[in-house]
Structures are given as C-alpha cells and as structure tokens.
Amino acid sequence: MSSPKIVLYTNHLCPWAHRAHIALKEIGLEYEEVIIDLSTPREPWYLEINPVTRPRPHHHLRWNHCNRIRHRRPIPRRRPPNPPPPPSSPTENALYRARLSFFVDAFFSKVLPSFFASLRAANETERDAAAEQLVAAIVKEVEPLLADTEGKGPFFGGSDKLTLAEVQSGPFLLRTLSFAKPEHGLVSAKLSTLLEQAPRFKRWAEATATHESVNFIYDEKLVADKMRAKFAPAAKV
C-alpha cells in the first residue's frame, strides 16, 4: 500500500513548523511543500482551508504525524533495515513517555526563556548575562535528566537515533548554538565555553544540531538576520 500524499503548509523560518520537517524526514514520508509567506496577509485560498480561528495546517499536520510515532522508541522509518525490537511493557512505555514529556517541558520552560532574553538584549553585557542564566538553568534542570546517555548514544534515553525529544527541541538547539557565532551577535560568544559546565547537554545539543534531519532546511544567515530584525531593541527617545 502506498503512503498517503500529504501537503505541508510551512515556513522555514518558523522553529515550530521546523519540527514537522524533522519528523517527516526521519520517517521518510514524501510530501508536497507549500511555503507560507509570514510577512504578508494570508491569501484567500489559504484562509479557505485554514480560517484564522483554527490551528495552522502545519501545526495540525505536525501533531497528527508526530503523535503517531511510538514514544518509547527512536523514530522509525517506514522500511526499517532491521526488525523492530520486541515491545516493552505498558508500564515501561508510560514511564518513558512521562520522562520524555518532563524533559521537553524542562527545556522549554526553564532554558528557552534565557534564549529569547538574549535575542532581545541591547548589548553584549546583557547577552553574556542571558547566556549565563541559560547555562545555569541547563545545569540545574536538564543536565541531570541526561544521565542515562553516559556511555550510550547522544540522544534522549541514550538512543543513537533521534527521538521525539529531539524533534521538538531540535530547531531551538540549532538556533541557540548557531546564533552564538560572532558574525550573528544574537547569543553570547561565551556560550560554547559556558556549556562545558554541562557536558551531557553539550554533547546532546551538538549531536542534535548537526543531524541531517534537523538542519537540512536551515538557512542560518537568513534565519539569524530575520531574528535580529524581529528582536532588535526599540530605539530610545
């Protein structure tokens, strides 16, 4: 049976839409891509299929397809080269899903606020402070949750393949690390050194950001330029 043809309404600048690309790349599902220009009013044809009071099509698609992926295993491909491992118990599955959800929530609620604070920073001093806060949150909230990666794969739970934790956090890890390059000036250049305080997280973040399924649509300079323009400090009167 052939896979259903789907249409992904998306924008490569959006980190939330980016997550759908990661999931679809990993499962090897072919799709037609329609880029939505977020800088202009929506076209009539777009509003016909997606009234403004409803979720965006790429959000609907993202959750429909991501939620069909088994949480307890790395994201499977449609035709895996080897037989899948035998199923584990319902209790183990439930615990894994809970751990993954807790991990992702810790990253988004405790770490990302400092990333956005860095984007809004008016000067290097504020960016350095945001980076220190970001790493402090990582050390306290996220680093301990990666203890089971010691001596194993770099991804969540010690997996050697992407899991839903990387699907959800990947676009933000990619932006955080790349924005720390001096040419972008959006995140403190001290970030790489600061992350040495959290070696498990650093390994996880770098492995995720360099994975082809995570970065294949990422235009670093374009995204950085757009973010700089969007979060530029307001001129003081």
Predicted regions mapped to residue ranges:
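Eukaryotic N-terminal targeting leaders
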Residues: 1-7, 230-237
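Surface-exposed helix-capping loop/turn segments at secondary-structure junctions
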Residues: 82, 144-158, 181-183, 211-218
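Short alpha-helical "patches" and their helix-cap loops
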Residues: 89-91, 119, 129-132, 182-203
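Charge-biased low-complexity scaffold regions
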Residues: 139, 144-150, 169, 175-176, ...
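GST superfamily/GST-like fold recognition
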Residues: 157-186, 194-202
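Acidic, serine/threonine- and proline-rich low-complexity regulatory tracts
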Residues: 200, 207-213
